[in-house]
């Protein structure tokens, strides 16, 4: 018989308890979220929250037969269950003392709370204190997806229990690939901690790791403790192993310490501190290796980044890094991370302010230049300090107005005691006004501005600009008006591409630029270089990039034409073809020191194409062609084919012609082919690889003499996807660390789903090196307490 009166009473009582519990949890979540500056939902002040004590929470009972005194002891027989807002108990027969909260379950006991399910042949439990014991229990932990079997379980409270003779696994397969056996396991769900004593990790029934004391999280949340060790080997440092320890200090900041041993160099300690608050965030990392066995001196590096909102539009940030010596990143790079190419370490601090129409900041920006002895570099200028101001007002009666001003003090570090250039101050201001006319199918944008620059320079009695002067003026100024007109049209028509309906566009564009000549040969050059000619640069006001220490005279017209084929149903761009050329009506008279002025009346041709020939094959082409000597100045061709998941082939060719002998303001040439692959080999085996090969030979400049044909990077690896819950990886990497030297690395990884990974994680390396790479293990969605409902 069913007790209808109890059902109705309990239904109303449980609804009230759920509301009270939910409101309290929402308030707690709001407080937590507010501490890190996230948007939050807050409880209305008009709602009253009532938290019932555990012994007052009403119960709902159901069974095929119910007997006894409803105010003292009740016996439920057949499909019996006791439901409360905080948990569910089921069994074949349940004796329930309502006055004490004691529950005795006989036969097919099931207990569910917060997504954790416990089953066993029998159980004794107090529903008020949630304490008791259960024989031969089986556990399913909803928050993590883990399962466990034990000989006996003692339950001390809602959040704490002890299991004896335990087998635990986070693998959901019928026959788990890995599991942990332990004499006892203590679980604390509030602290998100499990402690296994005399634990042994088994993989394929083979013990691979043992410890008298192991800790692990019981929920998919952060927890203090040791992380999985990483290990590998490199030619520069030998065998490399580290054992990180993670400190979950608070919800909004944490610390990771990384003891590390390198067989050729010694012991190193590293650390990373991360923090996040309302209006600020940052990270600080560092490493220290005392008395390097290879060099005999201490080796270290650090980097700290911070950004903070100060209120009323003000903010501050810094990015400061340093290393003990030039070769630190070539000798002690992180496994799987090619940091050997790191050249400039920033040392910047800034304070700024921003409003609707104005932005400004003051900063000090310096660098540490890590020199390669085989290819020394001139260190860039330090800005000590720089003041920057920008005002902008758009659609102001149809006009767009901008004003940009900077004031900088430049100082150049010495290189081996030698001075490499002048020092000085530079003041610039550049107001502009434009009137964009944008209509369906066409646009016209006239623009005018005046660029003013004032210099105060310490020349140190040297002819840095190579113009034959022995006595440069200490102060100089320059005023240059700049005028441009940008116009374009867009035509559309119905068309077809590869037999499919498409919309074709035709987009001609003209850009006229007029800049009168100003003699700038006696002005210093601090942070200005010749820009690469490209589709974007063809529509810019200056052929130089950076701080505009040179503004080229111009009387020129850029003509460009683009046509696209768009899928008629989705709008997806299937094919795009572009071409552009600049026509000069005036010779170039403004140059960088030692730069040869242009005399041609036409620029190189720019051509480009992108095509998604099918849903699995894409190609890109970009090239620059010199019509005067009928040679390619630069080019890039790439293609990627991804016919299915975990299958991709990417090939690319990059070329850039060498500059003429003695020209240092243009980049060095490049002639390189790259091939990257992820491919299924056989059943569960997958191959990954990449090779970058430089085809350079007979270099045109002495600076490129070391750039003979060679492999600049090679990656080869195998991945094996196990039958359930595990993946094995082995990856080999060889890469250039300088103009003449290379480093090799070999690392292994065993990834156990639900636990972590042993060894060095190569995923970031593979993601960066193989376009379209996909992990053989798809991401697992995070479990919740609502994974199971009964």
Curated annotation (Swiss-Prot):
Keywords associated with the record: Cell outer membrane, Membrane, Signal
Subcellular location field: Cell outer membrane
GO terms classed as biological process: Gram-negative-bacterium-type cell outer membrane assembly; lipopolysaccharide transport
Gene3D superfamilies: Lipopolysaccharide (LPS) transport protein A like domain
InterPro entries noted in UniProt: LipoPS_assembly_LptD, LptD, LptD_2, LptD_C
Transmembrane segments: none
GO cellular component assignments: cell outer membrane; transporter complex
Signal peptide residue numbers: 1-20
Record's keyword annotation contains NAD: no
Subunit description: Component of the lipopolysaccharide transport and assembly complex. Interacts with LptE and LptA.
Similarity field: Belongs to the LptD family.
Protein task: Together with LptE, is involved in the assembly of lipopolysaccharide (LPS) at the surface of the outer membrane.
Name of the protein: LPS-assembly protein LptD
Species classification: Bacteria, Pseudomonadati, Pseudomonadota, Betaproteobacteria, Burkholderiales
């Amino acid at each position: 018989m069913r007790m209808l009166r109890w059902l109705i009473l309990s239904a109303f009582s449980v609804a009230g308890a759920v509301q009270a519990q939910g409101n309290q949890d929402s308030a707690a979540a709001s407080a937590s979220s507010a501490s890190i500056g996230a948007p939050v939902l807050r409880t209305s002040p008009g709602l009253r929250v009532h938290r019932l004590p555990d012994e007052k929470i009403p119960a709902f009972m159901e069974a095929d037969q119910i007997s006894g005194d409803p105010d003292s002891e009740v016996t439920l027989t057949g499909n019996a269950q006791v439901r409360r807002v905080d948990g569910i108990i089921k069994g074949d027969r349940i004796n329930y003392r309502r006055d004490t909260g004691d529950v005795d379950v006989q036969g097919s006991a099931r207990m569910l709370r917060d997504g954790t399910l416990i089953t066993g042949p029998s159980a004794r439990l107090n529903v008020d204190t949630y304490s008791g014991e259960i024989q031969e229990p089986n556990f399913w932990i909803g928050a993590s997806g883990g399962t466990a079997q034990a000989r006996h379980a003692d339950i001390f409270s809602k959040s704490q229990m002890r299991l004896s003779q335990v087998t635990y696994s986070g693998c959901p397969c019928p026959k788990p690939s890995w599991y942990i056996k332990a004499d006892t396991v203590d679980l604390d769900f509030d602290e998100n901690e499990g402690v296994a004593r005399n634990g042994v990790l088994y993989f394929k029934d083979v013990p691979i790791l043992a410890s008298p004391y192991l800790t692990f999280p019981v929920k998919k949340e952060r927890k203090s403790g040791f992380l999985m060790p990483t290990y590998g080997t490199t030619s520069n440092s030998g065998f490399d192993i580290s054992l990180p320890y993670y400190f979950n200090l608070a919800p909004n900041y944490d610390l990771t310490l990384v003891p590390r041993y390198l067989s050729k160099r010694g012991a190193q300690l590293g650390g990373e501190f991360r923090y996040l608050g309302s209006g600020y965030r940052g990270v600080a990392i560092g490493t220290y290796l005392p008395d390097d066995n290879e060099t005999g001196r201490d080796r270290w590096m650090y980097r700290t980044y911070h950004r903070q909102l100060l209120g009323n539009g003000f903010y501050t940030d810094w990015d400061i890094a340093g290393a003990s010596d030039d070769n630190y990143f070539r000798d002690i790079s992180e496994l799987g991370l090619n940091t050997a190419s790191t050249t400039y370490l920033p040392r910047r601090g800034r304070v700024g302010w921003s409003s609707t129409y104005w932005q400004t900041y003051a900063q000090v920006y310096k660098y540490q230049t890590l020199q390669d002895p085989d290819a020394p570099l001139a260190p860039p200028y330090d800005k000590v300090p720089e003041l920057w101001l920008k005002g902008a007002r758009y659609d102001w009666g149809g006009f767009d107005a901008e004003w940009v001003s900077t004031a900088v003090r430049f100082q150049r570090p010495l290189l081996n005691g030698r001075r490499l250039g002048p020092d000085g101050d530079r003041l610039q201001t550049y107001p502009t006004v434009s009137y964009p006319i944008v209509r369906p199918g066409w646009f016209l944008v006239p623009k005018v501005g005046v660029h003013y620059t004032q210099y105060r320079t310490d020349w140190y009695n040297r002819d840095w600009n190579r113009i034959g002067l022995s006595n440069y003026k200490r102060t100089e100024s320059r005023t240059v008006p700049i005028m441009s007109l940008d116009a374009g049209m867009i035509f559309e028509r119905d068309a077809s591409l590869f037999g499919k309906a498409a919309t074709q566009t035709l987009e001609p564009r003209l850009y006229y630029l007029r800049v009168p000549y100003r003699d700038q040969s006696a002005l210093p050059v601090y942070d200005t270089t010749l820009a690469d000619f490209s589709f974007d640069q063809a529509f810019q006001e200056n052929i130089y990039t950076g701080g505009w220490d040179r503004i080229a005279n111009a009387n020129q017209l850029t003509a460009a034409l683009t046509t696209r084929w768009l899928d008629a149903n989705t709008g997806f761009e299937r094919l795009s073809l572009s071409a552009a050329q600049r026509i000069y009506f005036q010779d170039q008279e403004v140059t960088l020191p030692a730069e040869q002025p242009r005399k041609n009346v036409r620029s190189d041709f720019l051509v480009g194409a992108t095509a998604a020939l099918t849903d699995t094959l894409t190609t890109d082409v970009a090239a620059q062609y010199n019509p005067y000597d009928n040679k390619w100045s630069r080019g890039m061709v790439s293609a990627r084919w991804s016919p299915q998941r975990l299958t991709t082939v990417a090939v690319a060719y990059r070329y850039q012609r060498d500059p003429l002998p003695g020209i240092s303001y243009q980049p060095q040439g490049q002639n390189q082919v790259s091939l990257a692959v992820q491919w299924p080999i056989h059943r569960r085996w997958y191959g990954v690889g990449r090779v970058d090969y430089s085809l350079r030979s007979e270099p045109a400049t002495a600076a490129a003499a070391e750039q003979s044909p060679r492999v600049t990077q090679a990656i080869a690896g195998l991945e094996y996807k196990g039958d359930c819950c595990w993946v094995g990886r082995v990856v080999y990497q060889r890469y250039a660390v300088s103009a003449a030297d290379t480093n090799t690395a070999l690392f292994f990884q065993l990834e156990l789903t639900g636990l972590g990974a042993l060894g060095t994680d190569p995923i970031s390396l593979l993601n960066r090196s193989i376009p379209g790479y996909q992990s053989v293990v798809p991401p697992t969605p995070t479990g919740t307490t609502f994974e199971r409902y009964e």
